[in-house]
């Protein structure tokens, strides 16, 4: 789901601060993605200063960049957000000649619908969404999305503060495709999330895993 290759750090540096004594690379990434020690080592080895900001959701990232308040050399939007930002002229094309290791990326992850020619993005990370639960409190088999709508867990349910993921969970519960564009199916998913709202304690991002410790 997550895109833009980390090795672009070595390429994008040409674009930033080239007129300054110390070149600077401006990076905007998901929280908990890169250890600060790694950034420090990169700065020592290359002499390039990294200004590293993080975001919690694609929507937070989009709003900040769209507002024009910040400009970054390297960002990490998810698949659907790449399409949106590309269509709105918010992304620069990538010169793949500067990324020789691109040819080693698994072919399953290149040429996707959101960027068929990989002109604007390079695969960086892939993953799926699942259900995390405390086995000391939930003893029944968790084999369906239905459990997130079970009234007996009222105010003990945390949902991702992400439109894509929350709507996706509702679509899967309904038996629809994650990538449906059918207005009726999306409307059904929206209604299902509204019905679920009284059961939800909070809509969170990284806080979910902290509460499980």
Q: Residue spans of the language-model regions?
A:
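Short, low-complexity disordered leader/linker segments with a strong preference
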Residues: 1-25
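Early extracytoplasmic/lumenal segment of secretory-pathway proteins
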Residues: 18-84, 209-210
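Hydrophobic alpha-helical segments with strong N-terminal bias
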Residues: 1-4, 62, 112-114, 118-119
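Extracytoplasmic ligand-binding site segments that recognize negatively charged/polar headgroups
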Residues: 71, 76-213
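Glycine-rich, phosphate-binding/catalytic loops in enzymes
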Residues: 1, 44, 91-94
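Short, flexible, glycine/charge-rich loop motifs used to bind or transfer phosphoryl groups or to couple energy/partner
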Residues: 8, 14-18, 63-66, 121, ...
